[in-house]
Amino acid sequence: MSATPPRKRLSRRLTTTVAVLAAASGVLATAGPASAHHGRTVDVQMLSFNDFHGNLEPPQGSSGTVSELQPDGSKKTVPAGGVEYLASSLRAARKGHPYSVTAGAGDMVGASPLMSGMFHDEPSIEAMNKLGLDVTSVGNHEFDRGRDELIRKQKGGCHPKDGCYEKGKKFKGADFPYLAANVTDEKTGKPILKPYTVWKHNGVKIGFIGVTLKGTPDVVTAEGVKGLKFGGEVETINKYAQELDRQGVKAIVALIHEGGLPASGAYNYDCDTPGPGAGISGAIVDIAKKVTPKVDALVTGHTHAAYNCTIPDPSGAPRTVTSAASFGRLYTETTLTYDRGTKDIVRTPAKHPRAANHVVNRDQPKAPDMTALIDRWKKLAAPVANKPVGYISADINGRGSEAYEKPLGDVIADAQLEALAPADKGGAQIALMNPGGIRSDLAYKASGSEGDGVVTYGEAFTVQPFTNMMASVDLTGAQLISLLQQQVSGPNEAEPKILQVSRGLTYTLDLTKKGAARIDLSTLKLNGALIDPAKTYRVAANEFLAGGGDGFPAFKEGKNKKLTTSDVDAFIAYLTAHSSKTAPLDPPKADRITVVK
């Protein structure tokens, strides 16, 4: 028996418009937001979250905490997350709100811990169904396994290779619509999934448009986005907002898998001090300033940051832009005041949508149906997940480290170098690891019954969940220099992506300079010798990075490419070879990149 029958009834009221009208040519006519109460108003509660990434169990280490700003200006670390607590939080929040809709901003699955990832994220889709998700945009990670797998997650059906995981049970797919307005088939030009949907309840109608970042092909393997075209976020949202407006749907929310970087890491930081939107930077700011005033609120994601900002729309009216960090640690509650007369959301300086982020605390009762779901899938995963693969003496921070060089990044790069150094494995001299591929920390505290300091297969998989194949290529010293300069120039100049480097490679990152000059070439050495632009070096990386992903096109110039083991297998082999109960692995010093600020 479902624990959430009211949500199931409400979900049926979320109806999708399937007809896609031809886009009007020329400049879209702008229309200001509802500015007066021409009829009775009703408050609609919108609960939202993003970047869940299949974290059904409470995340470990710093990935399972949020920073809370205290009245005296200090920060407090609060444990957070876990779908048992997320479901309880959302269900409690809905009480007393007859008009409530729950929305997501992408990356609900993908790069997931083993318990979800090894089952192609079917457990996470099942969990989203149970907790009452009404609608979500796609994110870049929804494309990790390609278009067909994403459509299977929407429509259901057993995995084409692995089949069904439970006897007599067929995967039903998502009860909620995945929206992908800016993702079209290269041949037909049509969206591969619905571009928008309309939520209806007692005469209230709110349109939801969903998009992922235009740069998705830069952060997903080529195979994952094969045959697809990713359009601009602003132009796509404006197109479908116009279409919804013509259909009489005036209240519109955009679900955007692209985000910003707040000035503070605290979830309750005031983004609007000293003025509206003053405390945020990044891609979402420009998007928010250009999206048509027909859209009343933006629910965003991708950067795993927490913020609630007011960024004025092109007409100057206040508009709320939200993000709820990641991994189910927070949810956002936004109040949308719907005017039955104008059929729009009220947005005036005196009254406009207000939002607040709430912590998914672990001191509340667990949702029993989610506990049962976790226990069921955990039992299926246990033979693989609980196997010890290594030992550590303390936390080794990766995802949770704010440093450019992360201790766990050093471990992973060393593991990849060791795996690909033998001549028959590629003969690598250097290994480079993209920081975005480090999905968690290695926590010393036990996550189950394995004991403190024991690293299980499941924990190692959570750090490296993509199972990318490892590649080694020939790069000249000049190409290697260009590659390292791309960390801080071109598309990565505003938000540097500092690659994690294997032992022996050292250099100085000078942040007092601009662009490519931040890489001090006079300090760039391999085993103490300066990198020679004319010499050839054998460089290892996961296949995504070696294919030019994350804004590193210099990697595509590599020659004599050789594929060998997977990244997670290399990582596990290294942990096993370099640790034991009596001699656990210590966190490395992370002293290969010297940072000058």
Q: Which residues make up each language-model segment?
A:
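Flexible glycine/proline-enriched surface loops and loop-helix/loop-strand junctions
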Residues: 221-222, 317-318, 395-400, 464-467
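N-terminal accessory/precursor segments of enzymes
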Residues: 34, 210-222, 350-352, 378, ...
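Acidic, metal/ion-coordinating pockets
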Residues: 2-5, 36-358, 411-418, 431, ...
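Glycine-rich phosphate/diphosphate-binding loops and the adjacent beta-loop-alpha structural elements
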Residues: 385-405
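Feature captures C-terminal
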Residues: 42-45, 55, 65, 166-182, ...
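Long, compositionally biased non-active-site segments enriched in small/hydrophobic residues and glycine
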Residues: 367, 372, 385, 389, ...
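Conserved, carboxylate-rich catalytic/transport cores that coordinate ions
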Residues: 362-365, 410
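Secretory targeting and sorting signals
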Residues: 1-36
